[in-house]
Design a protein with these regions (language model features):
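Arginine/glycine-rich "motif VI" loop of SF2 helicases in the C-terminal RecA-like domain
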Residues: 38, 127-128, 152-153
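Short, conserved aromatic-histidine micro-motifs
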Residues: 65, 101, 148-163
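N-terminal amphipathic, basic helical "cap/leader" segment at the start of enzyme domains
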Residues: 1-94
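Short, basic/glycine-rich phosphate-binding loops at helix/coil junctions
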Residues: 5, 96-103
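Small-aliphatic-rich amphipathic alpha-helix that forms the alpha element of a beta-alpha
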Residues: 32, 100, 105-147, 160
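Short, surface-exposed beta-edge/turn micro-motifs
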Residues: 43-44, 96-99, 156-157
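Short proline/glycine-enriched turn/loop segments at secondary-structure junctions
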Residues: 146-152, 168-173
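C-terminal helix-cap and adjacent tail motif
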Residues: 4-12, 83-87, 92, 158-186
């Protein structure tokens, strides 16, 4: 059932190096392409990266910007990042067997919103395939997109490292239903 998939899905930052057939990811993209989109433009593009050199370069570029970002962060955000053990290091960009880079075509109306709907479908499909991921939104999107020669009209929305989780873990607490909804008015 869909609710069970959603409840079991969690973010994973540490992956086993164990490979798996890329067909599993392709099936997930099949699911994602069924997502609704503004004016039915389907503005998403999924790029699967397996090449270790490309993964290394993507990581290098991401960490360069993340390091600077982490130096500048202050206050509550800094405290939260420390509490959650979120650092500038992005090992998962090389550890996961595959990276799935998801782009939106900026020439299409509602491209960003539509692409993120497809990302949601993709994440649930990964869960159904027994795979794990996290939604990493890289700060220097254009510079990262250059590694894979993405056309300028494609905006990198997220990079999803995909693989089997290295360790068990628990899903973080979700807000109660009454905290996130109402009828007719707030």
């Amino acid at each position: 059932m869909l609710l069970d998939l959603a409840k079991s899905r969690r973010t994973v930052r540490k992956f086993k190096s164990e490979s798996f057939p890329v067909d599993k990811i392709i099936r997930c993209i099949e699911v994602a392409r069924e997502a609704p989109s503004g004016i039915n433009k389907q503005p998403w593009y999924f790029l699967i990266v397996k090449d270790p050199e490309k993964k290394r370069e993507i990581r290098r570029r991401c960490e360069k910007f993340e390091r600077d970002l982490h130096r500048r962060v202050r206050g509550e955000l800094k405290e939260w990042m420390e509490r959650e053990n979120i650092t500038w290091r992005k090992d998962f960009l090389e550890e996961a067997p595959y990276l799935v880079m998801i782009f939106s075509d900026i020439r299409a109306p509602y491209s960003r919103e539509s692409t993120w709907l497809a990302v949601g479908y993709f994440l649930l499909a990964l869960e159904e395939e027994g795979l794990s991921s996290l939604t990493y939104t890289p700060p220097p999107a254009r510079e990262i997109a250059e590694v894979v020669n993405a056309p300028r009209y494609y905006r990198l929305e997220t990079i999803l490292p995909v693989g089997y989780p290295k360790e068990g873990g628990r899903k973080k607490r979700r807000k109660e239903l009454q905290e996130i909804m109402d009828f007719d008015s707030f």
